[in-house]
Amino acid sequence: MMFTDWHEAAIGKTHNRMNFDCGDADLNQFLQRHARQNHEKGTTKTYVALDNSDVTRIHGFYSVSPASLIYAQVPGAISKGLGRYDVPVFRLGRLAVDKSMQGQGLGAQLLLSAGKRCIQAALQVGGVALLIDAKNKQVCDWYKGFGAVPLNDQPLSLLLSFKTLYAALSASGRL
């Protein structure tokens, strides 16, 4: 089942961050204490999935920022054809879904939304992939299900190429 009764917005003061609970204290704390401030300062941008009938209720969120990787860290499938210098990417710093919404496909939708946002930015400033730091093997395997590949030297850090994301966005009619 795919949950579709939501819309995305930049995090703001009117959004009820205190009632969000994804089951992970660190992610909850980031949303409650740091996400909006970081967004306003420009260090990391956070976007929230809001309930269409209650625009203060946060169902999920993701945070992104620009980053780069040393060429040697990047798997060959992504580095092929690139110059041998730092590889421009976007870091998916956090992605979480409220416990009440887990298992309804919102996490996948947020991943695609983050990918689309970063692809659009990359058209202006460059970038080839989404860099993901998985918290554990289970989360790592979830991202691998979308085509993410581990970095050469860090098995819980993955790259999801914009080529793969673009294909998924096209297939889902989200471009």
Swiss-Prot record:
Disulphide linkage map: none
Null mutant phenotype: Deleting the operon causes 50% reduction in persister cell formation in mouse bone marrow-derived macrophages. All 3 tacA-tacT operons can be deleted without an effect on growth in cell culture.
UniProt KW Thylakoid keyword: no
This protein's domain notes: The C-terminus is an important element for recognition by the cognate antitoxin.
Record protein name field: tRNA-acetylating toxin 3
Transmembrane stretches, start-end: none
Keyword Repressor: yes
Lineage, opening ranks: Bacteria, Pseudomonadati, Pseudomonadota, Gammaproteobacteria, Enterobacterales
Quaternary data: Homodimer (in absence of antitoxin); has a condensed and elongated form. Forms a complex with cognate antitoxin TacA3. Forms a 4:2 antitoxin:toxin complex with cognate antitoxin TacA3. Forms a 4:4 antitoxin:toxin complex with promoter DNA, where 2 TacT3 dimers bridge 2 TacA3 dimers. Only TacA3 contacts promoter DNA in the octomeric form. TacT3 may contact DNA in the hexameric form.
UniProt-reported outcome of changing residue 80 to E: 54% toxicity in E.coli. Loss of tRNA-binding
Pfam families, A to Z: Acetyltransf_1
